[in-house]
């Protein structure tokens, strides 16, 4: 390696010279251009002899500024008693060899002093025996002897693993470099000559200057048993395990102290201040006090664990025992955090003044914002700390398995918290921004959102899938979609909770994360959830809202709406024997026996004849009734023995019970209507109700025809649906038209203004010419 290459490598490794973006073909010219203004030289002498140059020009613009910088460097070199060059030798480049000799002498003179400085033993040019592996300076090797000594030294340390400790901070300037902080332990993966080594820190591999670190001797090395194999490392493992555990305790104490300081110094005084209302302060605070108290409890528990002998430590077990509290505290905090950020945004000026009056540094709002976000950062830190502890823990340690379980639990909790925060932020956005095509009262009047998620839905038998955002309130389910430009949300409809029937489809149809919503007031909807967690949450919340005294057992998994109606009433009655009729407690009306709408108008034909035949034949055999009832879906396959029993007395008893239920309802209906007749109950037959409909065809011809009530209702339903769609399209077209008109108006005004200015300028120019 020639002197120019060695000097380039030396200056880059010291951090006083920036790495070139491309490979240097001529190191001498590179040095001339880099050192000409004297800034690099002043940085160098300050690095070698701190305080040698108090002030120098960082951005010299003139020759005098450059010469002054060079003179400052030469003054510092005088204390090293080396032969110096003239300032003009460097600035003009005429006698650059003297500059090189001076720099080489400075390096040699400071070699012994740098053993205690960031450059270390490798900072000298004699140690930089090869090219820099950072792809900026490519130089050949000239000292294989020292390289072989380093490799031999690594072999003696065990498993060819060289471990170093950072003595000073180093910030990466390229993507392939590694940023290190003072005290970091780096596992060297590649030793190259030239002052740059490759190593791994916290799972990231990159290049770092070798003279910024020092090698850890085997006697002082706190290594993990998993990092070295082939020799006894129990004392080293114990040493580093203790260090990591103490780090966990120290950071936990500091975290608890920061939370307590924020609560006492800022949040509690803010409560007595008039900047925020009671509701806003509650949103800002959330469950911060509970989190603060819990962290102090956790800190005490970990301290108690550390007092036992090392082989009896139960850090993982302690965290697992407290994991339910962790989950409840942090999930609640994450759910409230978007609302707290909204309060911070709305009252940023007032809160900033308050924080600064309380002693916070400017800007005060930043202190409050970052402090309220610390629980999230700490939650992520738990995973890293526990992984580090597990790395330096023996596999036979009694707490090893609990540590692994705790790592998984914290990773899961961290993911849940992130998802919950995103969901709540989206929910807050929906509630705070106007919704396009919204119908009815404001969405805020519906109360709090119980659950919200993005789903994919299908209408009826339609195979087309649509993305929707479902918002569940206590009384209604709101359906929204993203606007075409993804700038907001559009209203797509709502489903009342009353009368809603929810069925799981994962069990019935074998589809994962799917359920259906049906009811008398809504068309069948199939909902596909994104994951099983959302699916379980939807089923739990919908079951809770729809399953009750007024829902009439709407969650029963039967395919027949009429059967589900009858059986649901029986579930609300008093306990009775197998053949006793139910005792009707709630008021009953004839409308309760109205049949569900058929899938097609012709499905109800012959209903009266079938009913009369059923009631006539039921007196002869109970089995006759069973033939005309909807077949029930079996939950599981019955064995042969169960099948035989089913065909015997159980079948007769069940059929008789169904018949008694129907007869009881008919009797109750007759009683409520004030009649005591034993005849067949009056049933509304939509197909027999005829209406005279006058229609006008497209050709202008008027036709009068007779239609059944069912046909008329379905025709009206289709017309209403078409009208709604047309109305929605007209609203969208109107909005687009208004927007286009506004844009056109702005454009016209702009053109008129430009035209007016042109006319004025032309008239003024003509006037000046005439004058």
Swiss-Prot record:
Where is each Calponin-homology (CH) domain found?
A: 1-111
SMART domains under this entry?
Answer: CH, PH, RhoGEF, SH3
Q: Which UniProt keywords apply?
A: Cell projection, Guanine-nucleotide releasing factor, Phosphoprotein, SH3 domain
Which tissues does the record link to its expression? Detected in adult heart, spleen, lung, skeletal muscle, kidney and testis. Detected throughout embryogenesis.
Q: What is its main location?
A: other
What are the Low complexity biased-composition ranges? 122-131, 556-572
Q: Name one GO biological process term.
A: lamellipodium assembly
Instruction: Tell me which residues make up the PH domain.
Output: 442-547
Per UniProt, residues of the DH domain are 240-420
SUPFAM superfamilies from the UniProt entry: Calponin-homology domain, CH-domain, DBL homology domain (DH-domain), PH domain-like, SH3-domain
**Subunit and partners:** Interacts with PAK kinases through the SH3 domain. Interacts with GIT1. Component of cytoplasmic complexes, which also contain PXN, GIT1 and PAK1. Interacts with BIN2. Identified in a complex with BIN2 and GIT2. Interacts with PARVB. Interacts with PARVG; the guanine nucleotide exchange factor activity of ARHGEF6 is essential for PARVG-induced enhancement of cell spreading.
Described function: Acts as a RAC1 guanine nucleotide exchange factor (GEF).
Q: What is the name of this protein?
A: Rho guanine nucleotide exchange factor 6
Q: Write the gene name.
A: Arhgef6
């Amino acid at each position: 390696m020639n002197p120019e290459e060695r000097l380039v490598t030396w200056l880059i490794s010291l951090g006083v010279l920036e790495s070139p973006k491309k490979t240097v073909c001529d190191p001498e010219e590179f040095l001339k251009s880099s050192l000409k203004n004297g800034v690099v030289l002043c940085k160098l002498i300050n690095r070698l002899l701190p305080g040698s140059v108090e002030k120098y020009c960082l951005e010299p613009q003139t020759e005098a500024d450059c010469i002054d910088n060079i003179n400052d460097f030469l003054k510092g070199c005088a204390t090293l008693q080396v032969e110096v060059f003239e300032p003009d030798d460097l600035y003009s480049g005429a006698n650059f060899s003297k500059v090189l000799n001076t720099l080489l002498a400075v390096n040699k003179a400071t070699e012994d002093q740098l053993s205690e400085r960031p450059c270390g033993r490798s900072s000298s040019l004699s140690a930089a025996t090869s090219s820099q592996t950072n792809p900026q300076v490519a130089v050949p090797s000239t000292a294989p002897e020292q390289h072989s000594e380093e490799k031999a030294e690594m072999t003696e340390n065990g498993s060819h693993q060289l471990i170093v400790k950072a003595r000073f901070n180093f910030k990466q300037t390229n993507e392939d470099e590694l940023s290190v902080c003072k005290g970091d332990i780096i596992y060297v993966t590649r030793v190259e000559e030239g002052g740059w080594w490759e190593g791994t820190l916290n799972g990231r591999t990159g290049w770092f200057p070798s003279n910024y670190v020092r090698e850890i001797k085997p006697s002082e090395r706190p290594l993990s048993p998993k990092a070295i194999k082939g020799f006894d490392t129990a004392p080293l493992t114990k040493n580093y395990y203790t260090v990591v555990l103490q780090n966990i305790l120290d950071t936990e104490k500091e975290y608890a102290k920061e939370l307590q300081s924020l609560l006492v110094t800022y949040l509690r005084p803010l409560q007595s201040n008039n900047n925020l209302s009671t509701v806003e302060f509650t949103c800002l605070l959330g469950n911060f006090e509970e989190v603060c108290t819990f962290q102090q409890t956790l800190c005490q528990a970990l301290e108690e664990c550390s007092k036992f002998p090392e082989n009896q430590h139960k850090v993982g077990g302690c965290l697992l025992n407290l994991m339910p509290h962790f989950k409840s505290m942090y999930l609640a905090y994450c759910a409230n955090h978007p609302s707290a950020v909204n309060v911070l945004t709305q009252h940023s000026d007032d809160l900033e003044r308050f924080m600064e009056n309380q002693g916070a540094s400017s800007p005060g709002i930043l202190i409050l914002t970052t402090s309220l976000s610390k629980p999230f950062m700490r939650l992520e830190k738990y995973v890293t700390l526990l992984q580090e502890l597990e790395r330096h823990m023996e596999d036979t340690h009694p707490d090893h398995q609990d540590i692994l379980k705790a790592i998984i639990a914290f990773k899961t909790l961290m993911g849940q918290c992130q998802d919950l925060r995103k969901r709540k932020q989206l929910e807050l956005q929906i509630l705070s921004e106007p919704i396009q095509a919204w119908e009815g009262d404001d969405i805020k009047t519906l109360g709090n959102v119980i659950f919200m998620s993005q789903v994919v839905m299908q209408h009826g038998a339609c195979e087309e899938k649509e993305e929707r955002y479902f918002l569940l309130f206590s009384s209604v389910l709101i359906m929204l979609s993203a606007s075409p430009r993804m700038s907001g949300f559009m209203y797509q409809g709502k489903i009342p909770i009353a009368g809603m029937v929810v069925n799981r489809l994962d069990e019935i149809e074998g589809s994962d994360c799917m359920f259906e919503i049906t009811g008398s007031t809504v068309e069948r909807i199939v909902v596909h959830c994104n994951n099983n967690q959302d699916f379980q949450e939807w089923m739990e919340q919908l079951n809770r809202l729809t399953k009750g005294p007024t829902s009439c057992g709407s969650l029963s998994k039967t395919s027949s709406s009429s059967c589900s109606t009858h059986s649901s009433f029986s579930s609300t009655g008093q306990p009775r024997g197998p053949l006793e009729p139910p005792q009707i407690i709630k008021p009953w009306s004839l409308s309760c026996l109205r049949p569900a709408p058929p899938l097609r108008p012709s499905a109800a034909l012959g209903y009266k004849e079938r009913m009369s035949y059923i009631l006539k034949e039921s007196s002869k055999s109970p089995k006759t009734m069973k033939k005309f009832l909807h077949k029930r879906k079996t939950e599981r396959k019955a064995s042969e023995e169960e099948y035989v029993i089913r065909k015997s007395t159980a079948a007769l008893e069940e059929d008789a019970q169904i018949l008694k239920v129907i007869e009881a309802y008919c009797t109750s209906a007759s009683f409520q209507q004030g009649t005591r007749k034993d005849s067949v109950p009056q049933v509304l037959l939509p197909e027999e109700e005829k209406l005279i409909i006058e229609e006008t065809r497209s050709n202008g011809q008027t036709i009068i025809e007779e239609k059944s009530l069912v046909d008329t209702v379905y025709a009206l339903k289709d017309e209403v649906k078409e009208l709604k769609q047309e109305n929605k399209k007209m609203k969208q077209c109107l909005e687009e038209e208004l927007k286009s008109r506004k844009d056109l108006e702005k454009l016209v005004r702009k053109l008129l203004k430009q035209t007016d200015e042109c006319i004025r300028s032309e008239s003024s120019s003509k006037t000046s010419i005439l004058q």
